[in-house]
Amino acid sequence: MEDIATKLRRIREIFGYSQDYVANRMGISQPAYWQKENGKRMPSEERFGQIAELYNLSVEDLKWEELNTVLIKVHKMQIEILEKKVPLGV
C-alpha cells in the first residue's frame, strides 16, 4: 500500500492540489483522503476511478505502474498542455 500511497501524494503535489481539494472532488473528507495518501487505507475501486479521472490517468497506472513511470506520464501531459497554451515558434 505504501507505493500507491506515495504515488497519490506525489501526483497530487505535482498538480499543486491540496488534500482538501482532492477530497472534495471525491466527495470525502480530508482526513479520509489523508488515510489513503498515507497508506492507512486502500482506496476502493470507485475511489481509484475518481482519482484516476481527476489526474487523467488509468486505474492501472495508479495501481500497477512504477512511480517514476507514472510521474513521467504526468509531466508529459503537463508539457502537452503548456505547448497548447503557448505554441512553440511564435
What are these regions (language model features)?
Residues T6, G16-Y17, P43-E46:
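Residue-level signal for the short linker/turn that defines the boundary of a DNA-recognition helix
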Residues M1-I14:
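A short, Lys/Arg-rich alpha-helix, primarily the initiator
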Residues E13, G27, N38-K40, L67:
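Residue-level detection of the helix-turn-helix DNA-binding "recognition helix"
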Residues E13, N24, E53:
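Alpha-helical residues within the helix-turn-helix
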Residues E53, K63-V90:
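Short, charged recognition helix plus adjacent turn
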Residues G27, S44-D61:
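DNA major-groove recognition helix of helix-turn-helix/homeodomain DNA-binding modules
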